[in-house]
Amino acid sequence: MNEQEQQIRIAIVDDHEMFRAGVIATLQPHFDIVGQASDVEGSVAMIAQTKPNVVLLDVHVPGGEGGGGAEILMKSRAYSPNTVFLALSVSDSPQDVGSVIRAGAQGYVTKTISGDDLISSIKQVYEGYAVFSPKRSEERRVGKE
């Protein structure tokens, strides 16, 4: 772990405990894991308390008013305005991507991403870059030709 990796504070939001545990095991050697949550209300409270640099955010999370990840993002801005959000979801539907990007997520990757690519994506959004999973990027490139 280098010094830049250690200083990046990460929070993980996903309603599947086993998935969160796997992500934490993958990221813990590289980053400071400061919190985790499984629903809208718990996520907003955790983000307000821990003020992470980056939140890995599932799109479909129970609770709140039914807005899932987009709702968490919008409600958390007031408490942690400098936090960057990277959506990490099993879904790659345009509706899901659009909802969190419109809400302010810096990127969107699918859960098929490798551990190394996830680490790289976190560093990139932390540095201010937008990140999208290779499948979404390829679809955009093809659509513009």
Predicted features along the sequence, with ranges:
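Non-catalytic signal-transmission and effector/linker regions of two-component phosphorelay proteins
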Residues: M1-R9
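Two-component signal transduction core modules
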Residues: Q36, V55, F85, Y108-V109
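Conserved active-site segment of CheY-like receiver
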Residues: D15, L88-D92, K111-I113
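Short amphipathic alpha-helix used as the core "switch/output" element in two-component signaling
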Residues: G67-N82
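Short, flexible helix-to-coil linker/hinge segments that flank and couple to helix-turn-helix
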Residues: Q95-R102, G107-K144
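Two-component/phosphorelay signaling modules centered on CheY-like receiver
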Residues: E17-G35
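Active-site residues of response regulator receiver
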Residues: D58-H60, S89
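Acidic, metal-coordinating helix/loop segments flanking the phosphotransfer/catalytic sites
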Residues: S38-V54
